[in-house]
Every structure is written in C-alpha cells, then in structure tokens.
Amino acid sequence: MWTADEIAELCYEHYRSRLPKQGKPDPSREWTSLAAVVKVESAANEAGSAVLGTLQVAKEVVALGTGTKCIGLNKMRKTGDVLNDSHAEVVAKRSFQRYLLHQMRLATSYQQCSIFIPGTETGKWKLKPNIIFIFFCSHTPCGDASIIPIRETENHLSKSVDGHDIAGQSVLCSSSNCDHRGPEDKRKSEKMASSHMIKRMKNADGGFFSTITEDMAVQQVFAKPEGNVNPECCESSEEMQAANKETNAGKLKAVGVYRTGAKFVPGELSDTLIPGIEYHCVGLLRVKPGRGDRTCSMSCSDKLARWNVLGCQGALLMHFLQYPVYLSAVIVGKCPYSQEAMQRAVIERCRHISLLPDGFLTQEVQLLQSDLQFEHSRQAIQEGQTSSKRKLVPCSAAISWSAVPEGPLDVTSDGFRQGTTKKGIGSPQSRSKICKVELFHEFQKLVTSISKENLPDTLRMKTLETYWDYKEAALNYQEAWKALRSQALLGWIKNAQEYLLFM
C-alpha cells in the first residue's frame, strides 16, 4: 500500500538527506521546485499489487530534479551540450532516462538486478510486471494544468473544487477523487519580485479573496461582471460558465482563476486576456516563458501529456524496448490544484488518439495530490519569512540525481555544469550528465557493448551516425509521435534538425 503523502515524504526525505547543499536554494531569499520518479516494486509473484495498493511494496526514489529555469532560443546550441529546459519535471524525467539507460546496460549484461526482462523480439526488453513508476512534482505543472478555477464560500479561503477543506486529507493510490487545493502557492516567472504583497480584498458577497501582481507564472485573477465574453476564442467560455455555477456542497462559485505564465504557441488559438475567469483559454499548447528571449520549450503540462502517450524513455531507448515505460501515477504536492485541470491537461487532450503502433496507448494515469508541502517551495519560504521584506527569487541552479553507480549528482546553472565559465563552455567538463549529447554517448556505449546479432532490427538495418539518425530510426516511436502531433498536439514546437545533427 502507498499513499500520495507517503510518496511525497519519500521524495522530500531523499532531497533532505541524500543531496548536499550544492544547488539548493538559500532559504532566506530563494525557492525552487522539485520533481522525482519513484519505483514501486511488489513481490515478484504479486504482479499488479503495486498498482492496487493492497500489499506491502518497496518504494525507492530512482530519479530527482529541481529547477525553475529555461533558456531562450539565442542560447540553444547545435552541439547538444546545453540543457534547454531546467524545470524540475524535465530534469527529473531526463534523470530518469539516465537511470533507464543504466538498467538497460544491466539487462543486456544479463544481470538479474535489472528492472528489465527479455521481450519476445530479438534485442527487445520489457519492464518487469511487478514494477511501476510514480511521478511526483511539488507544484502543479506549468501550462494548462495550472489554469485552475478559484472557488470560495463566504469568508473562507483555500477551499478545494469539491468543497472540502485541505487539512487532514490523505489519498490512497487507488483513489480517483483527489481534488485538493493548498492556500496561495503559485509559481512565479523569472521576473517576479516576491516582495509584492498579497492583499486580501472583499468581494460583493462579503467573502475574501487574494490578489497579486501580474508577473507571476501562476497567478490568481478574479471574476468581473458578466458580459464581454468572446465565445469564439475556444471552449473556455462554456467551461468557465459551468465552473461558475454554485455547487450543492457548500455553494462554491468560481470567483477567479489561477493564471499560468506559459505563453500560447504562435499561430494557435490565443488567450482572451479578459480580466477574470475568462482570461485564459484551456486545453492549449503553451511554451515556457523566458527572460526577454522567447523559449522553444513546451510547458510541463504539455510534456506530461506527451509522456502519457509515448512513455518516458524517449526515442533512443525505444530501440531496445518492446513497450514504452509509462507512469502509473502523477502526484502533486500541496499547492493550488484542480483534479479537473490535471485530467484535462494530462489525459483528456490525447484520449481520442487512434492508429497508434502496437504497445502505445493514452494511459489512464492516476492523478493525485498530497497534503505535504515542499520545504523550499515559494510558499513555504514565504511563510517562513513573514517578518522579512527581503525579495524572494527562484534559485538559479538545477539539481539532477539518478540512481546510478557513477556520478549520480549533477548540478547545473543556465544549462551548464555549475561553475562553468564562459571560456569553459563547450568543453566536456561543462556538460550536464543529462544533456542530449551526454545521454546520446551513454546510449552509444550501450549499443557498442552488444554483439550485432543481438541488436534489435532498427539498429542493424543501416548505418546510423548522428543523434538525429538514431532518433528517426526508432520507427514505432516516430510513428506514434507523428500520430500524436497530427491528432492532438498540432502546434507542438519541434527543434530544428540542425540542433540534432551532433555525434
């Protein structure tokens, strides 16, 4: 059995006890976000019990990431040696891929301790049936999942969408009704000055709400008088009107919406920008905000939706896998949260996908929330600095940790190993262990360690040289990705081929 709180505490304890201070925020002035992947393993003869949560299981953090930053287009490199996206969710996922590469090396060396067992095709492997993976993030993913209706009852703040107080709730992994919302925890954009005061203001019904300035990555905006709604923008008008109706349990109304700082994709539908609950259109693809220069990194909500169809292993490892490596659950820490928004962002947008290759499927991943707050979240730092006027800023560093024997820890800043000088950029010493070129080199070592007759067909059919070559040769993965883009994620921004031709 496991609960959302148990998974959250396991990740927080790993962060506290297994990682050094390097890369962590200075709690007097900095905050960060955390994400992790947890392996849940049941007894070998009790396959499936880890999902049902009915028996004792072994839980282990196998990958962890922190970070809030993202580089702009002008800092991207064609050599694959910079981290474009250092949001915690992406760092954790790339750290997980490093772990999977190590586990595949163990499998191809026929070591029983690997999480993989032989598949039915030559050179192919599959995950042991008694193992699942759970993704944890300390804050709601940026983008569509962070567009959350704010509901209130008279003179009460911080209520969840279904009318229950936050305090004291605990969620079992098998629960499907997990709609919690923390107080006013919002992720800021890089320009955010945390000295902005959060004000309590009275509304027409005599209740109170909070308001903050508009440069946050996740913000609250509040309902304006009815009218002046653009029904042609997207379906948000109908959805928000429905959300604004009073519920039977507590007569909750949508009085505002948490905003996301992620920007809509150029050429796609755009937000109305109407003050109040109509500000955002929901269900859109979004790119992460950058400081000045626009980024090419899709929001974490969009990336989770992609991983929920294609798996977390990426194109390279798919050469060796019979089936993708999927997440069984996504758990969010204590923060503003909506089950409806998470369901929409991660699952619903891609549920209708058809004509996927064998083994690929839109997963009904469990979406849960914990009541436990991350100690270095922006809200936690603010609560601990109530008497201080000091400005809070996002921590500039990102931490990657993988359950691998050699160099598990990796700390970066601005896309390179922390401490790298301008002169040192481009050297092997400047690279993160989870940048594209480093993961590619680990993959190449795996390929060369296997005799040709034991390689999968996709790696024996033709000469492959560049990162691009190997990715494109993963035919079933590319077919699935093409179907996903054409049917659901139409506006997805892909990196130009010139950024993928390194060796």
UniProtKB/Swiss-Prot annotation:
Domain of life: Eukaryota
PROSITE patterns assigned to the protein according to its UniProt record, in alphabetical order: A_DEAMIN_EDITASE
Sorted UniProt keywords: Hydrolase, Metal-binding, tRNA processing, Zinc
Cofactor note: Binds 1 myo-inositol hexakisphosphate (IP6) per subunit.
Entry cofactors: 1D-myo-inositol hexakisphosphate
Annotated 1D-myo-inositol hexakisphosphate binding sites: 94, 303, 306, 436, 471
Positions that bind Zn(2+): 87, 142, 300
Keyword Protease: no
Protein EC: 3.5.4.34
Summary of the function given for this chain in its UniProt record: Specifically deaminates adenosine-37 to inosine in tRNA-Ala.
Name of the protein described by the UniProt record: tRNA-specific adenosine deaminase 1
Lineage: Eukaryota, Metazoa, Chordata, Craniata, Vertebrata
